[in-house]
Amino acid sequence: GPSAPRRVFISNAMLPMASEVHTLLVPIYGDSSGLSASRIGLILGSFATATFMVRLLTPWISRRLNEHQVLTVALFIAGAVYLAFPFLRNAGTLMFLSFVLGIGLGAGQPMVMAILHTHAPPGRMGEAAGVRMSLVNSMAVAVPLLFGVVGGTFGLAPVLWSVGVCLTTGGWLTRRANAGPSP
């Protein structure tokens, strides 16, 4: 399988992707669901609130779970939210899902940096951080373009489900990699 730094880079690409898709598609999805702009803003705000709150709890969380466990849970939470999103249209429910997504992504992103720091070859942390930033910035450009085309062609549900499957698969791979080699 992929080396530890490569797995970290893959996970690192998934988390910003999930955040970008949320920011891009919630307004479109909310509008197509008949929600007002203020309700859509509340949905986006619930995501930001959860992200902020969980970041305040990061020291407490990291004393109880290791980075790989937090990242695994974050990917599974985010994947489950994206898989459920297309089935729901109520503003309150979407606010709740966005809040849960904010918890997952907010907890996972700092752990990626901790894992990257742990697995970067000695003396190459700057290089690893540079590759990470290049990847994150590339995702910020590519994801809206790609999913905009897919969503415009096939609708929003396949985009949301695809993101959910990617994140859930990432959680499974992260959990499997953290479990070590099979006997």
How would you label these PLM feature ranges?
Residues 81, 92-100:
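Paired small-residue
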Residues 42-51, 136:
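Transmembrane alpha-helical segments of major facilitator superfamily
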Residues 107-120:
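Intracellular juxtamembrane helix-capping segments at the cytosolic ends
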Residues 37-38, 122-132:
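Loop-to-transmembrane helix entry/capping segments in MFS-fold secondary transporters
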Residues 4-11, 15-33:
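Helix-loop boundary and gating motifs at the non-cytosolic
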